[in-house]
Design a protein with these regions (language model features):
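Glycine/proline-rich, positively charged
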Residues: 29, 36, 40, 79-185, ...
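N-terminal binding-site loop/beta-alpha segment at the start of enzyme catalytic domains
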Residues: 1-70
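Structured C-terminal cap/extension of enzyme domains
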Residues: 43-44, 172-186, 190-342
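A general structural detector for well-ordered alpha-helical segments in enzyme core domains, enriched
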Residues: 2, 34-35, 58-62, 87-91, ...
């Protein structure tokens, strides 16, 4: 069983983390069963967020009475100290616990620091002094903020998108975290569903002994796939290298990662799915993307207000309105049978 230590936190867990964002989409009974199955199989790191609707409550139900056996990380998107304390209180209540193992600032547009006027980092320190949190972390999608967080020495963990589509700058973050004795938690290890070979994804992550990937699962079949890697971890070989190289070529350039930070859209467009529809049609069974329900969602692109709010919020600097239009045009051609994706 491969283990990973999250830097100076000293937290050592199985090198398969459980990303609890997707369980907000399933029933509480199914979510509890999934989380408990993960634990029974050896997973002990569970990552959630106040922003993930009822995800925290489901983990709270799953691990009620066995808190010391799991490591729970959650997040706050608070912009000020008052909201920080509100979020922390709700999270503790939902998770049925009196402490959070790793409390993370959730994708802030800046790196919270003492004296920056927000009171956020000071609140973190006070929460830690009170024993309500044990370690301070930050999550982000922006290289500049991530680098600043590492360089500041203020954080014990960084959660950042990291998969086999990573750039050299992403790889440098992993190296810097190791040098700083800072835990690195890899989100989007499957690039929001664009990577469809979990064995290749796992083999890539396994090359970095300081990286803890968190796999977002909502189906038992998905979970069992990752559980199988606990005792039989995939290793990098020529076949996997060739697959990764192929995907890097196909997915190079500007594409939507599906992070959802552009949401909600004032026109009701499901941007985080619609803006990457062309890729989803070609990298997964296309029938699921051509249902009447999905057609209705894509048609909403016609209602785009061109307010550019999504563009301004995108942590990857994408021209989201243009990307939506390109995906919609391609989608219409596929629907009309003018373009084959099979």
């Amino acid at each position: 069983m491969e283990m990973v230590t999250l830097g100076k936190t000293g937290i050592t867990v199985n090198k398969n983390g459980f990303g609890a964002l997707p369980i907000q989409r399933i029933s509480i009974d199914d979510a509890v069963a999934l989380a408990r199955r993960a634990y029974e199989a050896g997973m002990t790191f569970f990552d959630t967020a106040r922003f993930y609707t009822d995800s925290e409550e489901k983990l709270g139900e799953a691990f009620d009475g066995m808190r010391e056996k799991v490591c729970i990380a959650t997040k706050t998107a608070a912009q000020n100290a008052e909201d920080f304390w509100k979020d922390l209180g709700v999270s503790l209540h939902n998770l049925r616990t009196d402490y959070i193992d790793i409390y993370q600032f959730h994708n802030p547009s800046f790196c919270p620091k003492p004296g920056d006027g927000t009171g956020l980092y000071e609140a973190m320190l006070e929460a830690k002094a009170q024993g309500k949190i044990r370690h301070i972390g930050i999550t982000n999608h922006r290289l500049a903020v991530a680098n600043e967080a590492i360089d500041s020495g203020l954080y014990e963990t960084l959660q950042f998108p990291f998969c086999y589509l990573a750039t050299e700058k992403d790889l440098e973050l992993v190296k810097k975290c190791k040098e700083a004795d800072m835990g690195f938690i890899a989100m989007k290890a499957l690039s929001g569903g664009l990577i469809n070979n979990s064995a290749a994804a796992y083999a890539f992550e396994a090359q970095y002994d300081n990286v803890l990937p968190i796999w977002g699962v909502q189906r038992k079949s998905e979970l069992e796939e990752f559980i199988s890697y606990i005792d039989n971890p995939p290793v990098m070989n020529d076949e996997i290298k060739a697959l990764i190289e192929h995907d890097r070529k196909e997915l190079s350039g500007e594409f939507c990662r599906g992070c959802g930070y552009c949401m909600p859209c004032p026109a009701g467009i499901e941007i985080n799915n619609c803006a990457r529809m062309s890729l989803m049609l070609r990298r997964a069974p296309s029938d699921a993307q051509l249902t009447p329900e999905m057609q209705a969602k894509m048609k909403k692109i016609e209602n785009c207000l061109h307010c550019n709010k999504c563009k301004s919020k995108c942590p990857y600097g994408l021209d989201t309105p243009t990307l939506l239009q390109k995906n919609y045009e391609d989608y219409k051609h596929v629907l009309a049978g003018e373009v084959s994706v099979r």
